[in-house]
C-alpha cells in the first residue's frame, strides 16, 4: 500500500480564495466594506462640504466592480506566486474628465451667477456624483505577487499599487 503524500492545500486554490476573500465584499457592496471605504474617503476629503454622503459615493464608485482570476502561477521553488486578475472598475481619471465636462457646461450657464457659496458647493457635489454615476467601468489586468511566509500565502505590499493603478487607469 502506498502512503499518500500531502504537502497541504493547493497553492493556486489558497491564493484564489484569498483574492475572493478580499474582492467579494467589494463586488457585492458588502455594507461593512462600503462603510470602511466611505470612512477612508471621508477622512481624505470633506465630501460632506459638497453634500456628498461617503457611502453613496463609494457605492457609485464601485458600481460595476468585478474581477476574474486569469491565472495563478507558483514559482518552481514553491515560495512565491503571481496571480493575474482582471479587475473591472470605474476610473477616477475618467470620472474626473466627465466632471470637468459637466462643470464646463454648468459654468457656461447663467445659473452660476445667482448661487451662494453653499449652493455652489452642493452643485459641485451633484456634479461629482453625476460624473461617477455616468462613468463606465473598464477592465484592467492586475498582477498580484504572493510569498509563502511561515506556511501562509501572503499578498505582497505591491497589491495596493496594482489596485490604485486599476482605479486611476
Give the predicted meaning of each segment.
Residues 88-105:
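Short, cysteine-centered beta-strand-loop-beta hairpins and adjacent loop/turn segments enriched
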Residues 66-70, 127-129:
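Short structured motifs
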Residues 121-124:
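C-terminal low-complexity, charged extensions that often adopt amphipathic alpha-helices
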Residues 7-68:
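Core segments of small alpha/beta cavity-forming domains
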Residues 2-4:
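C-terminal motif of bacterial Sec signal peptides marking the signal peptidase cleavage site
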Residues 79-89:
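A short hydrophobic beta-strand element
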Residues 104-119, 130-169:
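Short beta-strand edge/turn micro-motifs at domain boundaries
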